[in-house]
């Protein structure tokens, strides 16, 4: 994303003395992954370059990622490869993009910046949040779609800031952000409606919902 594009977007910054790792699964997963690589002599890689099963199992048990806990994942697969734990794709992408991990032969090890991250993880929050919310391209998305969504971030973040004051579910948030859509009860949903609602949950507003409890928009 170009610098001039980011300059037009709301600034994201940490708000107060907040335990970000306790509130953000992504931030927590990034810290834990770099810590594992630092204390365990690196994260082993398979011949294809994927994180090995030993680490994937460890991540499934320790990340505590909503919807992707060890119980959730092992209910689908008896053994877990990296591809079987979708959050690892985002965590690994972000760690690579921010140069917190690097590959050394058949392992991933922390960079010096990664070690700095472990010492002062909170100091990296603004960078991680801004990059993830505004620039990260999820699997199946296009760069154009991410750019087209930029004009909505002022609206999204301001509305979420207000809703977060009293608390709300992701479904409530979806109805607020997309009032033209009507979502029936789960038992009444068609496959198409369920897919649409899921896309909303995990695309635009799901990015900022995970961060909002510990951030604020600096520009209205």
Swiss-Prot record:
Keywords: Plasmid
The organism's taxonomic lineage, starting at the top: Bacteria, Pseudomonadati, Pseudomonadota, Alphaproteobacteria, Hyphomicrobiales
Protein name, as recorded: Uncharacterized protein y4jL
Top-rank taxon, per record: Bacteria
């Amino acid at each position: 994303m170009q610098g001039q594009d980011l300059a037009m977007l709301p600034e994201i910054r940490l708000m107060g003395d907040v335990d970000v790792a306790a509130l953000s699964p992504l931030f927590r997963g990034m810290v834990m992954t770099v810590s594992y690589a630092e204390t365990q002599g690196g994260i082993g890689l398979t011949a294809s370059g994927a994180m090995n099963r030993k680490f994937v199992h460890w991540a499934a048990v320790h990340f505590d990622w909503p919807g992707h806990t060890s119980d959730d994942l092992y209910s689908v697969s008896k053994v877990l490869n990296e591809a079987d734990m979708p959050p690892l794709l985002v965590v690994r992408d972000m760690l690579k993009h921010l140069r917190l991990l690097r590959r050394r032969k058949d392992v991933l090890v922390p960079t010096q910046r990664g070690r700095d991250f472990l010492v002062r993880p909170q100091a990296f929050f603004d960078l991680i949040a801004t990059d993830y919310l505004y620039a990260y391209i999820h699997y199946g998305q296009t760069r154009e779609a991410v750019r087209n969504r930029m004009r909505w971030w002022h609206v999204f973040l301001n509305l979420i800031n207000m809703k977060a004051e009293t608390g709300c579910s992701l479904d409530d948030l979806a109805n607020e952000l997309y009032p033209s859509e009507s979502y029936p009860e789960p038992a009444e949903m068609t496959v198409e409606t369920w897919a649409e609602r899921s896309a909303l949950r995990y695309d635009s507003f799901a990015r900022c919902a995970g961060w909002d409890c510990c951030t604020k928009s600096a520009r209205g």
